[in-house]
């Protein structure tokens, strides 16, 4: 491993800010995920929800339209600008996922779709701790993580794979966010990350692209 502990690893927002600033109409990034819609149907109307890593607001805006009290946080200002234009009633915050600018236990639920694995293990652990801090006891956390099934495929198909720290990989792919650190884990490693949470649902499956294995989880914050 040749990582430099002095360099930040949660840098993928640099890539995504460029994407958000040049987003085309009809992009898949404007369409909410079915998993999120199903999860939301089981939540109490008016619940306070944090969309952590909201991007251009595909979930924050849909949740707001469904009657929830939504806050959207992202480190990429381009995405938040899109949310402000489309749904000014959604509270937007520019910030880092491991330093959430919210008070303790202020959200009933938290959503983070394809977000918190952008960084090394320290970033991931600090982010999980922050989510637990802002989430009310008994509240749920819907999220995805990168599976090590995906790592084997990425190592084969992407250029210059390098493990810069434990389970944290970068690739020489200038047109992809994979040039920035990504954290991959198997089931045991992942469950060890989520101290203070109960697992309600967990599944390792592909997204729309073959080989794009992600863990899908719904967790409950323990008291």
Where are these regions (language model features)?
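A short beta-strand submotif of the Rossmann-like class I SAM-dependent methyltransferase core
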Residues: 112-115
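A short glycine-rich, Lys/Arg-flanked "PGG" loop and its adjoining helix->strand segment in the class I
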Residues: 125-137
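Class I (Rossmann-like) S-adenosyl-L-methionine-dependent methyltransferase catalytic domain
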Residues: 1-44, 56-99, 142-223
């Amino acid at each position: 491993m040749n990582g430099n502990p002095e360099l930040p690893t949660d840098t993928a927002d640099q890539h995504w800010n460029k994407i958000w600033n040049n987003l085309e109409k009809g992009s898949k990034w404007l369409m909410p995920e079915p998993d999120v819609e199903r999860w939301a149907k089981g939540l109490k109307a008016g619940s306070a929800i944090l969309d952590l890593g909201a991007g251009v607001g595909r979930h924050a805006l849909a949740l707001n339209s469904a009657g929830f009290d939504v806050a959207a946080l992202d480190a990429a200002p381009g995405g938040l600008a899109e949310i402000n234009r489309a749904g000014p009633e959604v509270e937007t915050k520019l910030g880092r996922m491991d330093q959430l600018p919210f008070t303790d236990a202020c959200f009933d639920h938290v959503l983070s779709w394809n977000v918190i694995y952008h960084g090394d293990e320290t970033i991931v652990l600090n982010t999980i701790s922050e989510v637990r801090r802002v989430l009310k006891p008994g509240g749920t956390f819907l999220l995805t993580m990168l599976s090590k099934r995906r790592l084997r495929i990425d190592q084969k198909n992407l250029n210059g794979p390098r493990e810069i720290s434990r389970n944290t990989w970068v690739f020489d792919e200038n047109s992809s966010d994979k040039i920035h650190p990504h954290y991959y884990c198997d089931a045991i490693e992942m469950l060890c990350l989520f101290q203070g949470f109960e697992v309600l649902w967990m599944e390792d499956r592909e997204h729309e692209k073959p080989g794009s294995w992600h863990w899908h989880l719904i967790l409950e914050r323990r008291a």
